């Protein structure tokens, strides 16, 4: 008689121009750990990566059963502006506030927009100056380590952990 453990899943949120190679590495690690995942999108229509790969999500963000998940992964993207302005996506992310969140490359900006990084240190794969041009304020980015910051003074481990959020 095999004992089964009811393992919670990891939600993967994909959006237009997501970075395929960033999410592929994370998915491989989860697969090796036999961690179940669900890929979410705004709709069940194919989502196109920045390199042209189309992925069909397993479910829509409206069908989330939060209790079935213990974590969320947000990939980077070539252009995240439309995604940041989508309130449905921001609301989806807010639901994971008390869960583990991994935000890759530029994806931490989604967490800033969702109010999950207020006053907390984080790393994002972009220069701060570019974000001011996109409407982010100095207070939004006070604790941010960007590309230029990391070149001047590298973060030793290559990521920043703030409570339940990894950037």
Residue ranges and their predicted role:
Residues 9-18, 32-42, 58-59, 63-102, ...:
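Active-site-adjacent pocket-lining segments in enzyme domains
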Residues 51-59:
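Short gly/ser/thr-rich secondary-structure transition/capping motifs
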Residues 40, 45-51:
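Membrane-interfacial amphipathic helices and adjacent loop/beta segments
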Residues 29:
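Rossmann-fold NAD(P)-dependent oxidoreductase module
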Residues 1-6:
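Short, Lys/Arg-enriched N-terminal segments with co-localized hydrophobic residues
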Residues 18-23, 48:
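Short N-terminal binding/cap micro-motifs at the start of the first secondary-structure element
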Residues 25-26, 92:
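Hydrophobic residues within alpha-helices
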